[in-house]
Amino acid sequence: MACSPLEQFAIIQLIPIHIGNLYFSFTNSSLFMLLTISLVLLLVHFVTLNGGNLVPNAWQSFVEMIYDFVLNLVNEQISGASSVKQRFFPLIYVTFTFLLFCNLIGMIPYSFTVTSHFIITLGLSFSLFIGITIVGFQTHGLHFFSILLPQGVPLPLAPFLVLLELISYCFRALSLGIRLFANMMAGHSLVKILSGFAWTMLSMGGILYLGQLAPFFIVFALTGLELGVAILQAYVFTILLCIYLNDAINLH
Protein backbone atom coordinates (compact mmCIF):
# COMPACT_ATOMS: atom_id res chain seq x y z
CA MET A 1 0.00 0.00 0.00
CA ALA A 2 2.98 2.32 0.62
CA CYS A 3 3.69 2.56 -3.11
CA SER A 4 0.09 2.69 -4.20
CA PRO A 5 -0.89 5.78 -6.22
CA LEU A 6 -4.19 5.71 -4.33
CA GLU A 7 -2.50 6.11 -0.95
CA GLN A 8 -2.69 9.89 -1.29
CA PHE A 9 -6.50 9.68 -1.14
CA ALA A 10 -6.64 7.75 2.15
CA ILE A 11 -8.83 9.23 4.88
CA ILE A 12 -6.79 9.55 8.08
CA GLN A 13 -8.50 9.97 11.43
CA LEU A 14 -6.93 12.87 13.34
CA ILE A 15 -9.32 13.40 16.25
CA PRO A 16 -11.67 10.48 17.02
CA ILE A 17 -15.15 11.64 18.01
CA HIS A 18 -17.84 9.05 18.75
CA ILE A 19 -21.29 9.93 20.07
CA GLY A 20 -23.10 6.65 20.66
CA ASN A 21 -23.27 4.93 17.30
CA LEU A 22 -22.56 8.16 15.43
CA TYR A 23 -19.12 8.84 13.98
CA PHE A 24 -17.98 12.47 13.84
CA SER A 25 -14.20 12.03 13.78
CA PHE A 26 -12.09 14.93 12.52
CA THR A 27 -10.09 13.66 9.53
CA ASN A 28 -7.50 15.02 7.11
CA SER A 29 -10.36 15.74 4.72
CA SER A 30 -12.08 17.86 7.36
CA LEU A 31 -8.79 19.60 8.11
CA PHE A 32 -8.13 20.64 4.52
CA MET A 33 -11.72 21.78 3.98
CA LEU A 34 -11.37 23.91 7.11
CA LEU A 35 -8.01 25.24 5.89
CA THR A 36 -9.52 26.07 2.51
CA ILE A 37 -12.43 28.00 4.02
CA SER A 38 -10.10 29.79 6.46
CA LEU A 39 -7.69 30.73 3.67
CA VAL A 40 -10.46 32.15 1.50
CA LEU A 41 -11.99 34.12 4.38
CA LEU A 42 -8.63 35.53 5.47
CA LEU A 43 -7.74 36.49 1.91
CA VAL A 44 -11.05 38.26 1.33
CA HIS A 45 -10.87 39.92 4.76
CA PHE A 46 -7.41 41.43 4.29
CA VAL A 47 -8.13 42.44 0.71
CA THR A 48 -11.37 44.23 1.59
CA LEU A 49 -10.02 45.71 4.85
CA ASN A 50 -10.76 49.47 4.93
CA GLY A 51 -12.45 49.21 1.56
CA GLY A 52 -9.39 47.91 -0.26
CA ASN A 53 -6.70 49.91 -2.04
CA LEU A 54 -7.38 52.45 -4.78
CA VAL A 55 -4.44 50.95 -6.65
CA PRO A 56 -4.93 47.21 -6.08
CA ASN A 57 -2.01 45.00 -5.09
CA ALA A 58 -1.49 41.49 -6.44
CA TRP A 59 -3.80 39.81 -3.92
CA GLN A 60 -6.57 42.35 -4.36
CA SER A 61 -6.29 42.01 -8.14
CA PHE A 62 -6.56 38.23 -7.77
CA VAL A 63 -9.74 38.47 -5.67
CA GLU A 64 -11.25 41.07 -8.00
CA MET A 65 -10.41 38.92 -11.02
CA ILE A 66 -12.29 35.95 -9.52
CA TYR A 67 -15.20 38.21 -8.60
CA ASP A 68 -15.46 39.70 -12.10
CA PHE A 69 -15.08 36.27 -13.70
CA VAL A 70 -17.95 34.75 -11.71
CA LEU A 71 -20.08 37.88 -12.18
CA ASN A 72 -19.67 37.69 -15.97
CA LEU A 73 -20.44 33.98 -15.83
CA VAL A 74 -23.69 34.62 -13.97
CA ASN A 75 -24.71 37.43 -16.34
CA GLU A 76 -24.05 35.27 -19.40
CA GLN A 77 -25.65 32.02 -18.24
CA ILE A 78 -28.63 33.21 -16.18
CA SER A 79 -31.23 35.25 -18.02
CA GLY A 80 -33.77 37.48 -16.34
CA ALA A 81 -33.80 40.54 -14.13
CA SER A 82 -30.61 41.69 -12.42
CA SER A 83 -32.29 41.19 -9.03
CA VAL A 84 -32.59 37.47 -9.77
CA LYS A 85 -28.91 37.26 -10.69
CA GLN A 86 -27.87 39.19 -7.58
CA ARG A 87 -29.92 36.81 -5.46
CA PHE A 88 -27.93 33.75 -6.54
CA PHE A 89 -24.54 35.35 -7.21
CA PRO A 90 -23.18 34.81 -3.65
CA LEU A 91 -23.96 31.08 -3.82
CA ILE A 92 -22.25 30.67 -7.19
CA TYR A 93 -19.27 32.80 -6.15
CA VAL A 94 -18.72 30.82 -2.93
CA THR A 95 -19.08 27.50 -4.78
CA PHE A 96 -16.52 28.45 -7.44
CA THR A 97 -14.05 29.88 -4.92
CA PHE A 98 -14.31 26.87 -2.61
CA LEU A 99 -13.78 24.36 -5.43
CA LEU A 100 -10.96 26.40 -6.96
CA PHE A 101 -9.00 26.62 -3.71
CA CYS A 102 -9.69 22.97 -2.82
CA ASN A 103 -8.30 21.90 -6.19
CA LEU A 104 -5.29 24.22 -6.03
CA ILE A 105 -4.39 23.25 -2.46
CA GLY A 106 -4.52 19.62 -3.57
CA MET A 107 -1.66 20.37 -5.98
CA ILE A 108 0.69 21.13 -3.07
CA PRO A 109 2.93 18.13 -2.21
CA TYR A 110 1.87 16.18 0.90
CA SER A 111 -1.48 17.98 1.00
CA PHE A 112 -4.89 16.38 0.53
CA THR A 113 -7.24 16.80 -2.43
CA VAL A 114 -10.69 17.13 -0.93
CA THR A 115 -12.45 16.98 -4.30
CA SER A 116 -10.87 13.62 -5.13
CA HIS A 117 -13.45 11.92 -2.87
CA PHE A 118 -16.78 11.04 -4.42
CA ILE A 119 -18.71 11.51 -1.18
CA ILE A 120 -17.55 15.15 -1.02
CA THR A 121 -18.36 16.06 -4.62
CA LEU A 122 -21.60 14.08 -4.59
CA GLY A 123 -22.73 15.70 -1.35
CA LEU A 124 -22.01 19.13 -2.78
CA SER A 125 -23.71 18.45 -6.12
CA PHE A 126 -26.80 16.84 -4.56
CA SER A 127 -27.27 19.63 -2.01
CA LEU A 128 -27.07 22.24 -4.79
CA PHE A 129 -29.37 20.16 -7.00
CA ILE A 130 -32.00 19.92 -4.25
CA GLY A 131 -31.75 23.68 -3.71
CA ILE A 132 -32.17 24.37 -7.44
CA THR A 133 -35.25 22.12 -7.53
CA ILE A 134 -36.76 23.97 -4.57
CA VAL A 135 -36.11 27.27 -6.37
CA GLY A 136 -37.91 25.91 -9.42
CA PHE A 137 -41.01 24.97 -7.42
CA GLN A 138 -40.97 28.28 -5.52
CA THR A 139 -40.82 30.18 -8.81
CA HIS A 140 -43.30 28.20 -10.90
CA GLY A 141 -45.23 25.96 -8.53
CA LEU A 142 -46.49 22.75 -10.12
CA HIS A 143 -45.88 24.29 -13.55
CA PHE A 144 -42.21 23.45 -12.92
CA PHE A 145 -43.04 19.89 -14.02
CA SER A 146 -43.35 21.26 -17.56
CA ILE A 147 -39.55 21.14 -17.72
CA LEU A 148 -39.95 17.38 -18.20
CA LEU A 149 -42.08 17.73 -21.35
CA PRO A 150 -40.72 19.73 -24.31
CA GLN A 151 -43.23 21.74 -26.30
CA GLY A 152 -44.67 20.25 -29.46
CA VAL A 153 -44.21 16.62 -28.41
CA PRO A 154 -46.85 14.24 -29.83
CA LEU A 155 -49.18 12.95 -27.12
CA PRO A 156 -48.34 9.22 -27.63
CA LEU A 157 -44.66 9.98 -27.01
CA ALA A 158 -45.30 12.14 -23.94
CA PRO A 159 -45.08 9.38 -21.24
CA PHE A 160 -41.86 8.01 -22.72
CA LEU A 161 -40.23 11.44 -23.01
CA VAL A 162 -41.32 12.47 -19.52
CA LEU A 163 -39.62 9.36 -18.13
CA LEU A 164 -36.45 10.07 -20.11
CA GLU A 165 -36.40 13.73 -19.07
CA LEU A 166 -36.97 12.76 -15.42
CA ILE A 167 -34.04 10.34 -15.49
CA SER A 168 -31.91 12.93 -17.26
CA TYR A 169 -32.87 15.60 -14.72
CA CYS A 170 -32.07 13.39 -11.74
CA PHE A 171 -28.73 12.34 -13.22
CA ARG A 172 -27.60 15.97 -13.40
CA ALA A 173 -26.50 15.89 -9.77
CA LEU A 174 -24.79 12.53 -10.17
CA SER A 175 -22.88 13.55 -13.30
CA LEU A 176 -21.87 16.84 -11.70
CA GLY A 177 -20.27 15.05 -8.76
CA ILE A 178 -18.72 12.22 -10.79
CA ARG A 179 -17.10 14.59 -13.30
CA LEU A 180 -15.24 16.57 -10.65
CA PHE A 181 -14.23 13.53 -8.59
CA ALA A 182 -13.07 11.44 -11.58
CA ASN A 183 -10.95 14.18 -13.15
CA MET A 184 -9.19 15.12 -9.92
CA MET A 185 -8.55 11.53 -8.85
CA ALA A 186 -7.36 10.35 -12.28
CA GLY A 187 -5.01 13.29 -12.77
CA HIS A 188 -3.39 12.99 -9.34
CA SER A 189 -3.03 9.22 -9.73
CA LEU A 190 -1.31 9.60 -13.11
CA VAL A 191 1.15 12.15 -11.76
CA LYS A 192 1.89 9.85 -8.80
CA ILE A 193 2.50 6.82 -11.05
CA LEU A 194 4.87 8.65 -13.39
CA SER A 195 6.67 10.31 -10.47
CA GLY A 196 7.26 6.91 -8.86
CA PHE A 197 8.50 5.51 -12.17
CA ALA A 198 10.94 8.39 -12.65
CA TRP A 199 12.20 8.12 -9.07
CA THR A 200 12.76 4.37 -9.45
CA MET A 201 14.87 4.91 -12.57
CA LEU A 202 16.83 7.64 -10.81
CA SER A 203 17.52 5.42 -7.79
CA MET A 204 18.82 2.55 -9.93
CA GLY A 205 21.60 4.71 -11.38
CA GLY A 206 23.78 3.70 -14.32
CA ILE A 207 22.43 4.25 -17.80
CA LEU A 208 18.92 4.43 -16.37
CA TYR A 209 19.95 7.70 -14.69
CA LEU A 210 19.89 9.38 -18.11
CA GLY A 211 16.69 7.59 -19.07
CA GLN A 212 14.82 9.06 -16.13
CA LEU A 213 15.03 12.57 -17.57
CA ALA A 214 12.21 11.88 -20.02
CA PRO A 215 9.74 10.72 -17.31
CA PHE A 216 10.66 13.74 -15.20
CA PHE A 217 9.89 16.11 -18.06
CA ILE A 218 6.59 14.30 -18.56
CA VAL A 219 5.84 14.66 -14.83
CA PHE A 220 6.49 18.41 -15.00
CA ALA A 221 4.26 18.70 -18.06
CA LEU A 222 1.50 16.66 -16.42
CA THR A 223 1.76 18.77 -13.27
CA GLY A 224 1.15 21.87 -15.35
CA LEU A 225 -1.71 20.12 -17.10
CA GLU A 226 -3.18 19.03 -13.78
CA LEU A 227 -2.99 22.62 -12.57
CA GLY A 228 -5.04 23.63 -15.59
CA VAL A 229 -7.49 20.80 -14.93
CA ALA A 230 -7.89 21.98 -11.32
CA ILE A 231 -8.96 25.42 -12.55
CA LEU A 232 -11.02 24.04 -15.43
CA GLN A 233 -13.03 21.64 -13.26
CA ALA A 234 -14.02 24.43 -10.88
CA TYR A 235 -15.15 26.41 -13.93
CA VAL A 236 -17.07 23.48 -15.46
CA PHE A 237 -18.85 22.73 -12.18
CA THR A 238 -19.83 26.38 -11.79
CA ILE A 239 -21.02 26.94 -15.35
CA LEU A 240 -23.18 23.80 -15.20
CA LEU A 241 -24.58 25.03 -11.89
CA CYS A 242 -25.52 28.31 -13.61
CA ILE A 243 -27.13 26.45 -16.53
CA TYR A 244 -29.19 24.22 -14.24
CA LEU A 245 -30.23 27.23 -12.16
CA ASN A 246 -31.26 29.09 -15.31
CA ASP A 247 -33.38 26.09 -16.35
CA ALA A 248 -35.14 26.13 -12.99
CA ILE A 249 -35.79 29.88 -13.11
CA ASN A 250 -36.76 30.27 -16.76
CA LEU A 251 -37.84 26.69 -17.66
CA HIS A 252 -35.43 26.55 -20.61
UniProtKB/Swiss-Prot annotation:
Keywords: ATP synthesis, CF(0), Hydrogen ion transport, Ion transport, Membrane, Mitochondrion, Mitochondrion inner membrane, Transmembrane, Transmembrane helix, Transport. It is found in: Mitochondrion inner membrane. One of its GO terms (cellular component) is mitochondrial inner membrane. InterPro entries: ATP_synth_F0_asu, ATP_synth_F0_asu_AS, ATP_synth_F0_asu_bact/mt, F0_ATP_A_sf. The chain crosses the membrane at residues 6-26, 31-51, 88-108, 117-137, 144-164, 190-212, 225-245. Pfam families: ATP-synt_A. One of its GO terms (biological process) is proton motive force-driven ATP synthesis. The keyword Ion transport applies. The keyword Nucleus does not apply. It is a multi-pass membrane protein. One of its GO terms (molecular function) is proton transmembrane transporter activity. PROSITE patterns: ATPASE_A (PS00449). Gene3D superfamilies: ATP synthase, F0 complex, subunit A. Belongs to the ATPase A chain family. Mitochondrial membrane ATP synthase (F(1)F(0) ATP synthase or Complex V) produces ATP from ADP in the presence of a proton gradient across the membrane which is generated by electron transport complexes of the respiratory chain. F-type ATPases consist of two structural domains, F(1) - containing the extramembraneous catalytic core and F(0) - containing the membrane proton channel, linked together by a central stalk and a peripheral stalk. During catalysis, ATP synthesis in the catalytic domain of F(1) is coupled via a rotary mechanism of the central stalk subunits to proton translocation. F-type ATPases have 2 components, CF(1) - the catalytic core - and CF(0) - the membrane proton channel. CF(1) has five subunits: alpha(3), beta(3), gamma(1), delta(1), epsilon(1). CF(0) has three main subunits: a, b and c. This is ATP synthase subunit a. It comes from Marchantia polymorpha.
